[in-house]
């Protein structure tokens, strides 16, 4: 894979001024939710769309974006270490399944980061690029500054709970927007199944499956193609899901946080795309009091 030239993108902002409605409790279980037009940034509907959330593994969308922008050779390899694997096992964190001493291709780390939500891959990419996770996180926060994300801060690459690893639904939508503008990020985030290269430790390679797509058949919402996404979960964050969908020539981003279960997050996603996309958001409709675009500590 060739390193892509970074596309020149004007600063993308989420526009709450035309939001005609807030999600009903009947339609959306998640405590926090937002649906935006991915081209204009206009908010179609939301629930506390600018409130503080813990993004859990949605963090990895920023991780892959920063990683891809800093990788020169996607066919290079990184040796997986005991020091990376052991703390994740102790924390019962998700891993792609690479083994100690295994030489893993960088491209395989990217797929392992997103599809099974591998914390091992997150730290491996950070160490490969920056020498340590701490140094890589500095790049993530620098990227937040570049994108104008004043309400987002990262403290780790995987989304494990930390008081200083936070965002908002609106900011996560912006991060997803930029990730989908990058062809390699888009390809990885859009993949259902991927097999890593064969190694001595994994002679058949590792079959990786998307935690999002494995919960979908693909035809649940007529006329809508959910093309990419990333799940997340911690006890504090609840169930989270950021997704990117198209309907005709239009594209949309939905972010959900603090849902009751992984399945309810999927059902919420279907409901959002099925019931809220048809709204005409070109007219000047004010957000009601519940839809305030002020940052809050909810």
Question: Where is each model-derived feature located?
Answer:
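Active-site-adjacent loops and short helices of periplasmic peptidoglycan-processing enzymes
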Residues: 3-170, 179-180, 247
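Penicillin-recognizing serine hydrolase domain
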Residues: 8-32, 132-297
């Amino acid at each position: 894979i060739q390193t892509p030239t970074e596309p020149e993108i004007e600063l993308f902002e989420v526009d709450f001024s035309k939001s005609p409605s807030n999600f009903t409790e009947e339609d959306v279980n998640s405590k926090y939710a937002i649906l935006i037009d991915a081209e204009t940034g206009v908010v179609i509907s939301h629930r506390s769309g600018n409130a503080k959330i813990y993004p859990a593994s949605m963090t990895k969308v920023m991780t892959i974006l920063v990683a891809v922008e800093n990788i020169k050779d996607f066919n290079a390899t990184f040796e997986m270490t005991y020091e990376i694997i052991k703390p994740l096992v102790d924390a019962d964190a998700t891993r792609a399944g690479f083994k100690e001493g295994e030489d893993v291709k960088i491209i395989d780390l990217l797929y392992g980061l997103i599809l099974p939500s591998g914390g091992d891959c997150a730290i491996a990419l950070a160490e490969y690029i920056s020498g340590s996770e701490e140094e890589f996180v500095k790049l993530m926060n620098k990227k937040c500054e570049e994108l104008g994300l004043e309400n987002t801060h990262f403290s780790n690459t995987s989304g494990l709970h930390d008081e200083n690893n936070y965002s908002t639904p609106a900011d996560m939508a912006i991060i997803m927007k930029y990730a989908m503008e990058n062809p390699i990020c888009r390809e990885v985030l859009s993949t259902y199944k991927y097999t890593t290269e064969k190694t001595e430790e994994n002679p058949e390679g590792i079959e990786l499956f998307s935690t999002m797509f494995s919960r979908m058949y693909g035809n649940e919402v007529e006329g809508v193609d959910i093309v990419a996404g990333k799940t997340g979960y911690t006890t504090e964050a609840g169930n989270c899901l950021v997704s990117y969908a198209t309907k005709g020539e239009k594209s949309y981003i939905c972010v959900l946080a603090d849902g009751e279960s992984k399945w309810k997050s999927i059902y919420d996603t279907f409901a959002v795309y099925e019931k809220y996309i048809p709204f005409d958001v070109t007219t000047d409709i004010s957000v009601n009091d519940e839809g305030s675009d002020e940052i809050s500590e909810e």
